[in-house]
Amino acid sequence: MTTGFSVAVAGASGYAGGEILRLLLAHPAYTAGRLRIGVLTAGSNAGSSLIEHHPNLTPLADHKLQPTDSTLLRGHDVVFLALPHGSSAKIAEELGPQTLIIDCGADFRLTDAAAWERYYGSKHAGSWPYGLPELPGGRDALHGTKRVAVPGCYPTAALLALSPAVTAGLVEPSVTVVAVSGTTGAGRAPKAELLASEVMGSARAYNIAGAHRHTPEIAQGLKHPSGGPVSVSFTPVLIPMPRGILATCTAPTTASLSEIRDAYEDAYRTEEFIHVLPEGHLPTTKAVVGSNAVHIGLAVDPDAGVLVAVAAIDNLVKGTAGAAIQSMNLALGWPEADGLSIVGVAP
C-alpha cells in the first residue's frame, strides 16, 4: 500500500474541483495524516482564496488558488485535473510518468479519434483507462494505473443502467436514453441560460438528435455479444435543481423481467455503490445526493416490448468527483470505498 503522498487539484474553484476536495477532506488517508492537500489552481480565479468559491471547505480556508501551470503541479503524487475539455492533454504531457493523473474532463475518454474530432473539434490526444470500475473489465484496468479518464456524468448513469442487459444480450443493440440533470452539470461559468430566472419553473431539452458530446461515450461503453455497435439515441434535459441525474433508458427486449433482474443482480451483486431496487420501486435523485451511490429500477413494458431501466446518481459525486476518488483508491491499492458514502442526504 502506498503511504505518505501529496495531492494537487487543477481547477479547484469549479464545482468538480470543489467536490473532489470535499471528498478528500473526509478520506481516511487525510484524517490519518497520510494525504496532504498541496497546490490548488484555477484559471481566471487564480490569486483568490479557495474559501471565496467554496465556503463549505473551511479546513482549507488558508489555501490560495495558483495559476494552472504544470510547473506548480509537478512533484505531487496525485494530480486531479478538473479543467475545461481540451485543456488536460498539454498539462498531462508535461507531468512525469510517475504522477497519478486523474482527468475529470473528456480529453482521454474516447478511443475513437474520429469521434473525438467530430464532437470536440480538436486533435485526439489518446485514451486512458476509463474510471468506471463497475463495467466489465473496468476494475482490472484501474489497478496500479498512472492515468485515469473519469467518465462523463450522463454516460455514468446510462451505462450502469444498461450494461448488464446489453452485455447479456437480453436487449437489441439499440437503446434510447432520456436523462434529466441539475444545473451543476453545466459547470460554474456564468451563462444566460443558467440564470435562476431562466431555469426555475422550466425544463429544457438541449443538444438532441445525436448532438451531445456524451453520445459516443455511451455507445463506446456498451458491449453487445453480437460484436456489432450499439446505436444510441440520447436526449439530455436540464431541470431546475442543482444536483442529480435521472436517466430513463429503454431498449427492445423479449426477455422477462425475472430474466433481466437476474442479469443485473449477477452483475452488481458485489458492487458496493450500486443498488438494484426491489421490483416495483423506482429511484429518485434526492435519495443519492451527496453520495457515490447508484440506484437502479427495472421494468419491462410487455405491450411495447421494451426494457425500462432507470438510474439515479449525484452528477457531482458518482458522476465526477466520487468516480475520481474511487479510481484513485484503486490505482493506489487502497480500499475502493475509502472516503465515499453510499448514504444520500435526504430530504
Swiss-Prot record:
Residues at the active site: C153
Domain of life of the source: Bacteria
Record has Amino-acid biosynthesis as a keyword: yes
Pfam families registered for this protein in UniProt: Semialdhyde_dh, Semialdhyde_dhC_1
Entry annotated with the keyword Transport: no
Location in the cell: Cytoplasm
Coiled coil: none
Keywords: Amino-acid biosynthesis, Arginine biosynthesis, Cytoplasm, NADP, Oxidoreductase
Entry-linked SMART domains: Semialdhyde_dh
GO cellular component, one term: cytoplasm
GO molecular function: N-acetyl-gamma-glutamyl-phosphate reductase activity; NAD binding; NADP+ binding
Family that this chain belongs to: Belongs to the NAGSA dehydrogenase family. Type 1 subfamily.
Biological role: Catalyzes the NADPH-dependent reduction of N-acetyl-5-glutamyl phosphate to yield N-acetyl-L-glutamate 5-semialdehyde.
The protein, known as: N-acetyl-gamma-glutamyl-phosphate reductase
Species of the source: Mycobacteroides abscessus (strain ATCC 19977 / DSM 44196 / CCUG 20993 / CIP 104536 / JCM 13569 / NCTC 13031 / TMC 1543 / L948) (Mycobacterium abscessus)
